[in-house]
Each structure stands twice: as structure tokens, then as C-alpha cells.
């Protein structure tokens, strides 16, 4: 009994520390990717094309690394992989201090940061306890979202004081996360190493066994990300509001998401499979309706209400979807499988803005991007709704 209590305490301590490490690394990512490089063209000689390329390469590196990181963790162990990641992140961001306007350093740092964050995510996802998955995944996604947003806002404030003087803060945050890592005892599901050919075959096998999940993993991210390029224009040109009022809408959505992740996500635990199905299906349908509604709204107060509803639903849909995916994963392949899943999700987030921007540009109508995003959620609702109904009938 005492050994069990000590083990539970150790697991809880490790989970909390990993949450803090995830928060800090996402904090650094928010500072650099969402804030620092976006401001560079306005305060240095860096061209917008360079920062846009850095932004894209960051997420390409993230998605590509996710695809193989589970296998690398099993082959080399967590200490080597994570330490390498921290070294890459710290060194690359440290270079930004000395070369704040170097195109090579800006792109290189973005790529290295994308690689460095990948193993932390995979370890977090694979270490979640099954009987507490909804609750713990709520905490994981909350740490991710809070880190990104607070990092972005914090860096925005520092840039207003001086555009490049506080660049050292990014590498400092990574250094703190790196130090905290040495107080964590990370365990993998197994440590079996395989030849490269065997690992490649396993990637193909994992992919084939989870094809059912790929539309949801890929298209959810694409549907949301498609709106990113047009939302500022939608706010200022269609709703005719200031940047501050638009920011308030983002904050309201973020607060709704945070509240849902912290308090509503635990509803997923110890509930029936049909409850989980209901949350996922309701989320897809509600997203379709709310996003479609945005195309007809010109009142900022209604937009704020919709933003709150989207945030609240997002905060419970993510843990529910994660729990649904977890049921398909073999217990000894968690790192590899979550890595592949994250890679597919990252690819969806990359193609979403591309489609959203192109649709608006070629049709010259912002509403068409809203219709495109809503249509994706309709397709997901029909596809997975059919699966849930068929699966429910089989269970009977």
C-alpha cells in the first residue's frame, strides 16, 4: 500500500513538472514564433518573406519530427533525445541575441525550436493515465494554450519597450525548462530498439491501423487554421471594429477554452463511450453552425458570444477526441503512435491557412472561407456520426 502511494506521488510529481516544462517551452515558442519574428519586418531590415518562411519551416520541422520522434525516443532514450532538444532550442535562440536581423539565424532558430518541442509533447501524451485522461488532457492542452498566449503577449510588451534588447528572455525560458527536466523521471512504455527498416515498417503499420482517425486529425486542424489569415480582415473590414475589440474576442475565446479545459474536460473520465461520442459529434455540429453564423454577423457583441461558445466547446472537444484516439493505440506503441498523430495534425494546421488564404484571394469573398471551414466540420460530423451509430449498434 505504501509503495503504491509513493508511486502515485512520484507519477503526480513527474506529471506536474512535465506540465511546467511544456508551458515554458510553449511560452518560448509563443514569444519567438507568434510575436518576435512577426514584428521583425517593422523594426529591422528583415523582409516579410523571410519571417513567413521561418513561420512555415517551424511547423514543417515540428510535424516532420513528430513522425519519427517516438521511434527515436525508444532507440536512444529520453535523456539523449530531450537533452538534444533543449540544446538545439537554447543554442538557436541564444544566437538570436547576437544576430537579431540575420535571415539565416531567424529561419534556423524557427526550425530548431520546432524540432525541440516535439519530444516533450509526445512524452506528455503517452504519460497520461487512462482513468484520468479527460482531466489530465485538459491540463495538458491548458498548459499549451496558456504558454503560447502568455508568451506572445509578454513578448509583445517587451518589444514595445525595445524591439530586440529583450531577445535573451527566450533562451532564458528554455534554460529554466531544461534545468527542471533533471528533476523529472521520464519512463517510456518500453525500450525495445529496432533496426531502421523495422521502424519504417512499424510507421506504415501504425498508419494503416489508424486510417479511421486521420480525417479527424487532419481536417480539424485544417478547418480552424483556414480562418487564421482572414480573421483580422474580417474584424476590421466586415465587423468594422478596432484591433483592440478583435483582441478582446480572441481573449474571450481563450478564457472559455481555458475554463472548459480545467473544469469541463474531467467530465469525459468515467463516462460511457456513448457520452464521449456525443461530445465529439456535438462539437463538430456546433462548430459548423457557429462558423457558418460568423459569415452573417456584423455585431461585435454577438461575435464575442460566439467566440465564448467556440472556446468552451473546444476545451472539452479536444480531450474527448484525444480519449477516442487513445482507445485505438497499443499500450506498447504510445510514443510512436502519438508522434504520427501529432505529425498529421501539424500537417493539417499547415495546409489550413494556405487554403483559407487562397479561397479568399481567388473568390474575393471572405465568407467563402467560413463556408469552407463549416463544410469540413459538416463532413466530419457525417463521417464520424455514421461510425458512432454503426459502432453503437455493434456493441448492442
Curated annotation (Swiss-Prot):
Location(s) in or outside the cell: Cell membrane
Gene3D superfamilies: MFS general substrate transporter like domains
Annotated metabolic or biological route of this protein: Cell wall biogenesis; lipoteichoic acid biosynthesis
GO biological process: lipid transport; lipoteichoic acid biosynthetic process
Entries under SUPFAM superfamilies matching the protein: MFS general substrate transporter
CDD domains documented for this protein: MFS_MdtG_SLC18_like
A single GO cellular-component term on record: plasma membrane
Keyword Glycoprotein: no
Molecular function terms from GO: antiporter activity
TM region positions: 15-34, 46-73, 80-99, 105-126, 138-159, 165-184, 211-231, 243-264, 276-298, 304-326, 338-358, 370-390
Topological relation to the membrane, as annotated: Multi-pass membrane protein
Keyword field: Antiport, Cell membrane, Lipid transport, Membrane, Transmembrane, Transmembrane helix, Transport, Virulence
NCBIfam families to which the protein is assigned, alphabetical: MFS_flip_LtaA
Family: Belongs to the major facilitator superfamily. LtaA family.
Function: Proton-coupled antiporter flippase that catalyzes the translocation, from the inner to the outer leaflet of the cell membrane, of the lipid-linked disaccharide (anchor-LLD) that anchors lipoteichoic acids (LTA) to the cell membrane.
Protein name (database record): Proton-coupled antiporter flippase LtaA
Taxon lineage: Bacteria, Bacillati, Bacillota, Bacilli, Bacillales
Gene: ltaA
Amino acid at each position: 500500500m505504501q509503495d503504491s502511494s509513493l508511486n502515485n506521488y512520484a507519477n503526480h510529481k513527474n506529471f506536474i513538472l512535465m506540465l511546467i516544462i511544456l508551458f515554458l517551452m510553449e511560452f518560448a515558442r509563443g514569444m519567438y514564433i507568434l510575436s518576435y519574428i512577426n514584428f521583425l519586418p517593422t523594426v529591422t531590415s528583415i523582409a516579410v518573406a523571410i519571417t513567413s518562411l521561418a513561420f512555415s519551416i517551424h511547423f514543417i520541422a515540428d510535424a516532420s519530427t513528430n513522425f519519427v520522434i517516438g521511434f527515436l525516443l525508444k532507440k536512444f532514450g529520453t535523456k539523449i533525445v530531450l537533452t538534444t532538444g533543449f540544446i538545439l532550442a537554447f543554442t538557436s535562440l541564444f544566437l538570436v541575441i547576437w544576430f537579431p536581423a540575420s535571415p539565416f539565424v531567424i529561419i534556423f532558430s524557427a526550425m530548431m525550436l520546432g524540432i525541440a518541442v516535439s519530444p516533450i509533447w509526445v512524452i506528455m501524451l503517452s504519460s497520461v493515465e487512462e482513468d484520468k485522461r479527460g482531466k489530465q488532457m485538459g491540463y495538458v492542452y491548458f498548459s499549451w494554450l496558456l504558454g503560447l498566449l502568455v508568451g506572445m503577449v509578454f513578448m509583445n510588451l517587451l518589444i514595445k519597450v525595445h524591439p530586440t534588447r529583450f531577445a535573451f528572455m527566450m533562451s532564458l525560458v528554455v534554460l529554466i525548462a531544461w534545468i527542471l527536466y533533471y528533476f523529472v523521471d521520464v519512463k517510456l512504455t518500453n525500450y525495445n530498439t529496432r533496426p531502421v527498416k523495422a521502424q519504417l515498417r512499424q510507421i506504415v503499420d501504425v498508419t494503416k491501423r489508424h486510417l479511421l482517425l486521420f480525417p479527424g486529425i487532419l481536417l480539424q486542424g485544417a478547418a480552424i487554421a483556414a480562418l487564421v489569415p482572414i480573421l483580422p480582415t474580417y474584424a476590421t473590414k466586415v465587423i468594422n471594429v478596432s484591433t483592440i475589440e478583435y483582441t478582446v474576442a480572441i481573449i474571450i475565446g481563450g478564457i472559455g477554452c481555458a475554463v472548459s479545459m480545467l473544469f469541463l474536460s474531467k467530465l469525459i473520465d468515467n463516462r460511457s463511450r456513448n457520452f464521449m461520442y456525443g461530445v465529439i459529434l456535438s462539437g463538430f455540429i456546433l462548430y459548423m453552425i457557429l462558423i457558418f453564423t460568423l459569415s452573417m454577423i456584423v455585431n461585435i457583441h454577438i461575435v464575442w458570444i460566439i467566440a465564448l461558445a467556440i472556446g468552451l466547446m473546444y476545451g472539452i472537444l479536444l480531450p474527448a477526441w484525444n480519449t477516442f484516439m487513445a482507445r485505438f493505440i497499443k499500450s506498447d506503441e504510445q510514443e510512436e503512435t502519438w508522434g504520427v498523430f501529432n505529425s498529421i495534425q501539424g500537417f493539417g494546421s499547415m495546409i489550413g491557412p494556405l487554403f483559407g488564404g487562397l479561397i479568399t484571394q481567388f473568390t474575393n469573398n471572405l465568407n467563402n472561407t467560413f463556408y469552407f471551414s463549416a463544410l469540413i466540420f459538416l463532413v466530419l460530423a457525417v463521417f464520424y456520426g455514421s461510425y458512432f451509430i454503426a459502432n453503437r449498434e455493434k456493441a448492442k
